[in-house]
């Protein structure tokens, strides 16, 4: 067995340096507008407009990414997907950090989102108004994902 293979032990409930984070991100749209969620708390550096995020969360042990995406939409925006397109499985190991594996979805919502748990506000903007960063996602990546999904 090679030293660098991705073989892990049983799941744990705490963050562990050098481990693996499997997450789902839902880039949310409704009637052509981008839906952003103001969620105070976790704030990465470089955001222009405050605590703006797309719904995201870690996958639970054994949870399918599609099910996680639907769960996250209900938690953040009390909403359901009209359409859901997986546009990328993003894998990166930032220097000195853990492995990040993210399932990136473009989601068209059935109805407008409502504030879920710990959501301060919901903003709908035109795609051309995208800030430089939304959560950990750069504007250029968001635009690329929208293009891949045919939602640009």
Report each predicted region and the residues it spans.
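Conserved Nudix-box catalytic region and its N-terminal flanking loop in Nudix hydrolases
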Residues: 33-75
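Nudix hydrolase/Nudix homology domain
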Residues: 44, 49-52, 113-152
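A generic structural micro-feature
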Residues: 16-20, 48, 95-101
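Active-site-adjacent beta-strand/loop module that shapes the phosphate/pyrophosphate-binding cleft
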Residues: 30, 82, 90-114, 144
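Short secondary-structure junctions
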Residues: 75-83
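Acidic, metal-coordinating catalytic segment for phosphate/diphosphate chemistry
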Residues: 1-25
């Amino acid at each position: 067995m090679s030293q660098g293979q991705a073989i892990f032990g049983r799941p744990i409930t705490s963050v562990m340096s050098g481990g693996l984070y499997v997450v789902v991100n839902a880039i949310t749209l409704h009637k052509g507008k981008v839906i952003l969620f103001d969620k105070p708390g976790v704030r990465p550096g470089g955001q222009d407009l405050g605590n703006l995020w797309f719904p995201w969360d870690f996958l639970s042990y054994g949870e399918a990414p599609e099910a996680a995406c639907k769960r996250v939409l209900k938690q953040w925006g009390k909403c359901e997907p009209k359409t859901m397109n997986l546009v990328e499985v993003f894998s990166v190991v930032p220097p000195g950090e853990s492995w990040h594996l993210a399932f990136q979805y473009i989601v068209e919502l059935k109805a407008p989102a409502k504030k879920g748990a710990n959501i301060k506000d919901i903003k709908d903007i035109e795609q051309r108004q995208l800030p430089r960063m939304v959560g950990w996602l750069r504007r250029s990546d968001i635009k690329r994902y929208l293009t891949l999904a045919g939602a640009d």
